[in-house]
């Protein structure tokens, strides 16, 4: 299976990626992991990426695309792969098409996990952390017995600044603005598999497997 995994923050991509790579015995390729591996290996492109990252700059497309090309050419990708976090733009998607053509590979599908915005915001803003012991709770999935009090030590629970409603809304807006053209691009190519992420984890996985193996959207 050669696939791209897409979905907004809070859609549960990480959980699905872990299950898919185990099921299909394929590598999970995320841009962050690729950059780290290329830097560790000391490749020319890895060193170039490190310069930008150390300066706090975005790594330019030609470097990112070069690192992706090197990674997909490795033997463990011959039976398939799950790309996560790449491509992010239509320009990167075009470049990926060229890479796959050179490697004589076809993309089997683009999995897009969809969850209503209200649910995403609930997931993204629900986390609470204990100031004393660092214990983590979620107001929906794993709530404390008493609101704002840690079950373990009685410490005060607080919400991190990057878990606030305003921050979460901004993250979703940035994601939607950036990826909508990409979703349209893959829909036009007939590769987009739209998956309902607002159901239990096992059902989401089953829907992905059905869509990839039987071609149902």
Curated annotation (Swiss-Prot):
Its EC number is 2.7.4.3. Residues 30-59 are annotated as: NMP. It comes from the Bacteria. Zn(2+) binds at residues 130, 133, 150, 153. One of its GO terms (molecular function) is zinc ion binding. AMP binds at residues 31, 36, 57-59, 85-88, 92, 160, 171. Residues 126-163 are annotated as: LID. Pathway: Purine metabolism; AMP biosynthesis via salvage pathway; AMP from ADP: step 1/1. SUPFAM superfamilies: P-loop containing nucleoside triphosphate hydrolases. One of its GO terms (cellular component) is cytoplasm. The keyword Iron does not apply. Keywords: ATP-binding, Cytoplasm, Kinase, Metal-binding, Nucleotide biosynthesis, Nucleotide-binding, Transferase, Zinc. It is found in: Cytoplasm. It catalyses: AMP + ATP = 2 ADP. ATP binds at residues 10-15, 127, 136-137, 199. One of its GO terms (biological process) is AMP salvage. The keyword Nucleus does not apply. It is an enzyme of class 2 (transferase). InterPro entries: Adenyl_kin_sub, Adenylat/UMP-CMP_kin, Adenylat_kinase_CS, Adenylate_kinase_lid-dom, P-loop_NTPase. Catalyzes the reversible transfer of the terminal phosphate group between ATP and AMP. Plays an important role in cellular energy homeostasis and in adenine nucleotide metabolism. Consists of three domains, a large central CORE domain and two small peripheral domains, NMPbind and LID, which undergo movements during catalysis. The LID domain closes over the site of phosphoryl transfer upon ATP binding. Assembling and dissambling the active center during each catalytic cycle provides an effective means to prevent ATP hydrolysis. Some bacteria have evolved a zinc-coordinating structure that stabilizes the LID domain. Monomer. Belongs to the adenylate kinase family. This is Adenylate kinase. The lineage of its organism: Bacteria, Bacillati, Bacillota, Clostridia, Eubacteriales.
């Amino acid at each position: 299976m050669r696939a791209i995994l897409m979905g907004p923050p809070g859609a549960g991509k990480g959980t699905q990626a872990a299950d898919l790579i185990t099921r299909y015995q394929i590598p999970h390729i995320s841009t962050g992991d690729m950059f780290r591996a290329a830097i560790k290996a000391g490749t020319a492109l890895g060193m170039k990426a490190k310069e930008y990252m150390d300066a706090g700059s975005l790594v330019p497309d030609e470097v990112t695309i070069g690192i992706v090309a090197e990674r997909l050419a490795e033997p463990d990708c011959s039976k398939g792969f799950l790309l996560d976090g790449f491509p992010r733009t239509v320009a990167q998607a075009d470049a990926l098409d060229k890479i796959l053509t050179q490697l004589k590979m076809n993309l089997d599908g683009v999995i897009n996990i969809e969850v209503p915005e209200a649910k995403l915001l609930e997931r993204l803003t629900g986390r609470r952390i204990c100031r004393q012991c660092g214990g983590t709770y979620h107001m929906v999935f794993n709530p404390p017995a008493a609101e704002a009090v840690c079950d373990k030590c009685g410490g005060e629970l607080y919400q991190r600044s990057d878990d606030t409603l305003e921050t979460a809304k901004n993250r979703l807006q940035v994601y939607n603005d950036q990826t909508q053209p990409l979703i349209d691009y893959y829909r036009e190519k007939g590769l987009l598999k739209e998956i309902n992420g607002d159901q239990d984890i096992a059902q989401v996985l089953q829907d992905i497997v059905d869509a990839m193996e039987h071609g149902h959207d």
